[in-house]
């Protein structure tokens, strides 16, 4: 333990040494600018693992699975063998014989880098660094990670990189320690370096829980000029409660036993394999095993980390606490979790207190009109859970949490005509949300069918940055530029194609005619990107047009070669997007068809049950 703590101390010292120039750098910070502090969400902070000599051996931004088998101890191998043996016996006897403790033991081996000692420190040398400087003081690696995960060049250009900070934290952490850390970061890093007495906080997703608890613990700090919430989880997310409490949708068996499994984003072949494999055990035994896995996961990784408990909505918290936080060993955890659940319930009063006492400006940017798992495809497995088709969300967090107080009906449905006709209600154009109940209606913006990953919606981000730069104060200031109700945008592919086009120009191989055509396509694309009133259909057409032109030029000038890649030190022109559609592999086609046919026959014979259920029914 002492050695681990020494290593951690050395690592943190190194981080501070390479950023000590931050104070000098920020001497150039603009006096009339309030520094901006981003508080990122899940997957936006990077965590590093070091060996006993302080050498980095791994890094991750979410879950890290320990596949370094050479590091396994004899006890670790025993735990893993117990699990594998238990699964084999379970299949053989058609009954779940794998205990929750066996699963927990295996999880402790696989996710050891997220485990904590009794004193709260991590078992291994694991650090999620908070750099004591603005992004101008970041090293190349840290700056690259920040730029990819929080694209904010427009803000940087306006206020200077010396006024942009980021407070990082691990998703497997402590909500109260994170809030205390944010306070220390503001008081001891941001304010002294910038000379400001205020900050602008930009919480993103889970980051809202950190800010909420910061305001809970330090209500009279008076340091916050603005809070600009970007899809913030102010009151958790029902789908996370579903996950932690193993509350599955009644139609979940359809996903497991039929071709509806493809709705969660798997391909036809994989879906058919799942359909077949799921029948190996009787349905009840599959349920038992699944419940044990979830319970073990929650007890191993979520209960020790109150940051994740903070994602449980306040109206589901008591059920969670009754199930997982009983007993003396959980006294401290429960006290903290109880306190934060109370903070969630009182979020309106807390924010109003900041507004009234300190003049804090409050802004919210949110996506809506999707069921859980119903947008990008990255969260398709959320379709397994109970609230997936009764919510109105950005596919991860419901709109009443990201835009607190907003009323809604399920995504894809509408309030009644009578409700909409009531002038006291302010219903969205699609009819699924009512903003009249939002706690801060005049400073809340909504993006229809926008999924949780907002980094590819430049308009949503530009809105946040214009608010930070005092260019926007309310929905009434910017009805034409930033309407309160806007639409989904995903510029990921279009931005890639534009970047590829710039590389083609560098080559200087195009004819005058082709060069002019590509430049026109780029200009047209940039014009669409600049349009702040989003038309998804136009976005999609523009993206496809850009792809088509690039594909034609890549083929015509033979640009998808190793020689060109080496010349440019860039491999974007070799994207599969630019290659002609190839004939599918015949073996894959045959296997997909065969497995699909087998899966359908099994569905006809066995329905939504396992093989064992059928035989027990017969005999």
Walk through the language-model features, giving the residues of each.
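Bacterial N-terminal signal peptides that target proteins for export
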Residues: 1-11
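Bacterial N-terminal signal peptides
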Residues: 11-19
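Sec-dependent signal peptide cleavage junction
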Residues: 18-32, 614-615
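N-terminal non-catalytic accessory region
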Residues: 30-202, 208-260, 371, 390-395, ...
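Extracytoplasmic/secreted proteins, especially bacterial periplasmic and envelope-associated proteins
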Residues: 177, 181-184, 210-213, 493-496, ...
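Alpha/beta-hydrolase-fold enzymes
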Residues: 251-331
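C-terminal subdomain of alpha/beta-hydrolase-fold enzymes, centered on the catalytic histidine
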Residues: 319-496, 572-601, 605, 609-612, ...
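Beta-rich interaction/scaffold domains
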Residues: 487-578
């Amino acid at each position: 333990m002492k050695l681990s703590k020494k290593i951690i101390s050395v690592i943190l010292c190194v981080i501070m040494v390479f950023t000590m120039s931050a104070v000098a750098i920020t001497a150039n910070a603009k006096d009339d600018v309030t520094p901006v502090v981003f508080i990122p969400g899940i997957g936006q902070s990077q965590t590093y693992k070091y060996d006993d000599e302080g050498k980095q051996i791994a890094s991750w931004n979410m879950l890290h699975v320990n596949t370094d088998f050479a590091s396994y101890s004899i006890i670790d191998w025993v735990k893993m063998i117990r699990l594998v043996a238990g699964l084999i016996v379970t299949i053989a006897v058609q009954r779940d014989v794998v205990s929750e403790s066996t699963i927990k033991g295996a999880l402790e081996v696989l996710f050891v880098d997220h485990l904590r000692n009794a004193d709260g420190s991590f078992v291994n040398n694991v650090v999620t660094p908070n750099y004591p400087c603005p992004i101008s003081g970041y090293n190349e690696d840290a700056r690259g990670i920040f730029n990819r995960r929080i694209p904010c060049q427009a803000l940087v250009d306006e206020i200077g990189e010396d006024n942009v900070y980021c407070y990082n934290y691990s998703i497997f952490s402590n909500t109260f320690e994170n809030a205390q850390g944010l306070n220390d970061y503001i008081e001891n890093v941001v304010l002294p370096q910038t000379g400001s007495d205020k900050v602008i906080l930009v919480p993103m997703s889970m980051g809202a829980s950190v800010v909420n608890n910061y305001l809970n613990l330090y209500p009279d700090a008076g340091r916050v000029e603005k809070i600009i919430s970007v899809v913030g989880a102010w009151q958790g997310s029902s789908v996370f409660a579903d996950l932690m409490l193993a509350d599955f949708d009644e139609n979940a068996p359809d996903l497991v036993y039929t071709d509806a499994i493809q709705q969660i984003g798997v391909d036809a072949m994989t879906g058919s394999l799942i359909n077949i494999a799921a029948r190996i055990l009787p349905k009840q035994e599959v349920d038992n095993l699944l419940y044990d896995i979830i319970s073990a996961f929650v007890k191993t990784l979520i209960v020790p980390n109150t940051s994740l408990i903070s994602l449980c909505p306040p109206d589901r918290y008591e059920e969670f606490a009754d199930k997982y936080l009983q007993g003396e060993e959980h006294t401290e955890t429960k006290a903290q979790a109880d306190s934060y659940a109370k903070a969630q319930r009182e979020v309106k009063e807390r924010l109003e207190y900041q507004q009234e006492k300190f003049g804090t400006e409050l802004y919210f940017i949110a996506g809506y009109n999707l069921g859980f798992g119903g947008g990008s495809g990255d969260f398709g497995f959320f379709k397994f859970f109970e609230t997936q088709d009764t919510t109105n969300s950005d596919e991860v967090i419901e709109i009443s949490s990201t835009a607190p107080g907003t009323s809604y009906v399920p995504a894809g449905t509408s309030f009644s005509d009578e409700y909409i006709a009531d002038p006291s209600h302010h219903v969205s154009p699609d009819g699924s949300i009512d903003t009249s109940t939002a706690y801060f209606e005049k400073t809340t913006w909504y993006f229809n069918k926008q999924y949780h990953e907002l980094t590819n919606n430049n308009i949503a981000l530009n809105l946040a940055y214009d608010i930070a730069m005092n260019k926007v104060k309310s929905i009434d200031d910017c009805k034409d530029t930033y309407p309160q109700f806007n639409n989904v945008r995903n510029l990921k592919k279009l931005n890639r194609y534009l970047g590829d086009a710039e590389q083609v120009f560098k080559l200087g191989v195009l004819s005058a005619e082709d060069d002019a055509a590509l430049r026109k396509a780029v200009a047209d694309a940039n014009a669409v990107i600049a349009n702040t009133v989003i038309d998804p259909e136009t976005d999609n057409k523009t993206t496809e047009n850009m792809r088509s032109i690039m594909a034609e030029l890549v083929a015509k000038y033979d640009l998808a070669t190793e020689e060109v890649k080496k010349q440019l030190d860039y491999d974007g022109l070799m994207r599969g997007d630019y290659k002609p559609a190839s004939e599918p592999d015949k073996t894959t086609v045959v296997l997909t068809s065969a497995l699909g046919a087998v899966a359908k026959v099994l569905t006809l014979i066995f329905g939504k049950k396992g093989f064992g259920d059928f035989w027990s029914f017969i005999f």
